[in-house]
UniProtKB/Swiss-Prot annotation:
InterPro entries: GlcNAc_MurG, Glyco_trans_28_C, GlycoTrans_28_N
Broad class of where this protein is predominantly found: membrane
HAMAP family per UniProt: MurG
Pfam short name (any one): Glyco_transf_28
Membrane topology summary: Peripheral membrane protein
The protein's role, per its UniProt record: Cell wall formation. Catalyzes the transfer of a GlcNAc subunit on undecaprenyl-pyrophosphoryl-MurNAc-pentapeptide (lipid intermediate I) to form undecaprenyl-pyrophosphoryl-MurNAc-(pentapeptide)GlcNAc (lipid intermediate II).
Pathway(s) it belongs to: Cell wall biogenesis; peptidoglycan biosynthesis
The family this protein is said to belong to: Belongs to the glycosyltransferase 28 family. MurG subfamily.
Chain residues that bind UDP-N-acetyl-alpha-D-glucosamine: 10-12, 124, 161, 195, 295
GO cellular component, one term: plasma membrane
Domain of life where this protein originates: Bacteria
Name of this protein: UDP-N-acetylglucosamine--N-acetylmuramyl-(pentapeptide) pyrophosphoryl-undecaprenol N-acetylglucosamine transferase
UniProt-listed Enzyme Commission number(s): 2.4.1.227
């Protein structure tokens, strides 16, 4: 069996695709796997590092508004679909799996044109255009949650890396804090703005560092590769005996980040929400203020269950860290209660369930052919 995965662009698309690839390979070491991506996406680094083949196609951004860029979409899409068709033929693909994003729509179109079965996986509470279109023409549609409305949808969750899906935070806490050079006992706030970073979150945290230090809170700050220089230059002077402040551009070991943290301050991407629920880590979610509002909807079930707090991006310009984050990160009893409520919503086996669906789709093709 050969599987082609279309999930490039951001970590929220790439990581579930890679996790599915690993689940398929655990079942059959001989399975062929090719990931589709674009030359400018994170996949150019992440996919080879995990040992899988990467095939690059032209990205086809779909403007949300009427702009001159819309005029270029048809020609770009034709070129990308043609390239995917070539890859499907060269690999002898049995099934394609799309995760939304810039490379998914060309993948779905190429699969449909060539009669190849394909699987759609939608992680976001509000599906994007590629998956809304793709779900109309296949029986194999998986969604993160039953509330996500797509044709033929089966709620399976979001595939999570094994080290996260199997994480015992309490058992790994000492190891994780030592790994990052953090104190073993101090209240610990982890900050992450997604794979590209978040300027508003970064600026608010840097401004609040003296206050957090005065309260004995140590900070593990993943600023994003595009934001790291700005954060480094804006840091205030710190006393030699101040609680630890660890600044990173990117974290490849998010399992250890989650094990080290008492509380996350983060965006509300679908993958982030799924991971935090699965490991039972309370969070203050700051959804992206633009887009189609899917990040707020991603966090909504966790917040309503009491496993997280929702904070508007605009509130970061005020004293939200003093009012909301600081009292929470130092309240162990409340954090423990929130952890349990978040964990009750977590799903840890979505990789295996999605692998079942992929094998079902591939088997249907073999029966037909």
């Amino acid at each position: 069996m050969h599987v082609v995965l279309a999930g490039g662009g951001t970590a929220g698309h790439i990581e579930p695709a890679l996790t599915l690839a690993e689940a398929l390979r655990r079942r059959d070491v001989g399975v062929g796997i090719t990931l589709l991506g674009s030359p400018r996406g994170l996949e150019t680094r992440l996919v080879p590092a995990r040992g899988f083949d990467l095939a690059l196609i032209p990205a086809v951004p779909l403007p949300r508004r009427l702009t001159p860029d819309l005029l270029a979409v048809p020609s770009r899409l034709r070129a990308a679909v043609g390239e995917v068709e070539r890859i499907l033929a060269e690999t002898g693909a049995d099934v394609l799996v799309g995760f939304g994003g810039y490379v998914a729509l060309p993948g779905y179109l190429a699969a449909r044109r060539t009669g190849l079965p394909y699987v759609v996986h939608e992680a976001n509470a509000r599906p994007g255009l590629a998956n809304r279109w793709g779900a109309r023409f296949t029986r194999y549609v998986a969604v993160a949650d039953a509330a996500i409305r797509l044709p033929h949808a089966v709620p399976l969750g979001i595939p999570l890396r094994r080290e996260i899906a199997t994480l015992d935070r309490a058992a790994r806490r000492a190891e994780a804090r030592a790994y990052f050079g953090l104190d073993a006992e101090a209240p610990t706030l982890a900050v992450a703005g997604g794979s590209q970073g978040a300027r508003s979150i970064n600026r608010a945290v840097v401004a609040a560092l003296p206050m957090l230090a005065a309260a004995g809170v140590q900070v593990l700050h993943i600023a994003g590769p595009q934001q790291i220089a700005e954060v480094e230059s804006a840091q205030p002077k710190r006393a030699p005996d101040a609680p630890a402040y660890v600044l990173l551009p990117y974290a490849d070991r998010m399992d250890l980040v989650y094990a080290a943290a008492d509380l996350m301050l983060c965006r509300a991407g679908a993958l982030t929400c799924a991971e935090l629920a699965a490991v039972g880590l309370p969070a203050v979610y700051v959804p992206l203020p633009h887009g189609n509002g899917e990040q707020r909807l991603n966090a909504k079930p966790i917040v309503e269950a009491g496993g997280g707090v929702l904070l508007r991006d605009a509130e970061l310009r005020g004293d939200a860290i003093r009012r909301i984050v600081l009292p929470l990160v130092t309240d162990r009893a409340r954090l423990a209660e929130m952890a349990g409520r978040a964990a009750a919503l977590g799903r840890r086996d979505a990789d295996e369930r999605l692998a079942d669906l992929v094998e079902q789709a591939a088997a249907a093709r073999r029966v037909v052919t």
